[in-house]
Amino acid sequence: MKLFMFAAIIFTMASTTVRAEQCANNRKVCTWDGQGDTNCDCIGTACHEDDAHKVSVAGSAFYTCQPISAFRVCDGSEDVMDAGFSELYCRCSGGSYTISNGEVVCD
C-alpha cells in the first residue's frame, strides 16, 4: 500500500511538472487548427482557443502561450516563426501573415 501511494505521488508530481513546463516559453505555439498541445497552462486565459493568442497564417490558426499583443513588432528582417511553426518570434504590425519560400513573413 505504501509503495502504491509513493508511486501515485511521484506520477502526480511528474504530470504536474510537465504541464507547468508546457508554457514556460511564452513564444510557444500551443495549438494549431484545434490540434496539438492543448495542455498549455496559461494563467487567466484559455490560450489554446482565445483570439487574443491567435495568429492566422495561410488559413491556419496558431495559438501562442502569451497574447499576440505582448510580442514585439517584427522589424522586417527577421523570421516571424520558426521552421516547425512551434514558436512565434515577433508579430506583424498589420496583423497579416503569409508564407513565402516556406517561411512565415509579414504580409
UniProtKB/Swiss-Prot annotation:
The keyword Disulfide bond applies. One of its GO terms (molecular function) is toxin activity. GO terms for cellular component: extracellular region. Residues 1-20 form the signal peptide. Keywords: Cleavage on pair of basic residues, Disulfide bond, Neurotoxin, Secreted, Signal, Toxin. It is found in: Secreted. This is Putative conotoxin. The lineage of its organism: Eukaryota, Metazoa, Spiralia, Lophotrochozoa, Mollusca.
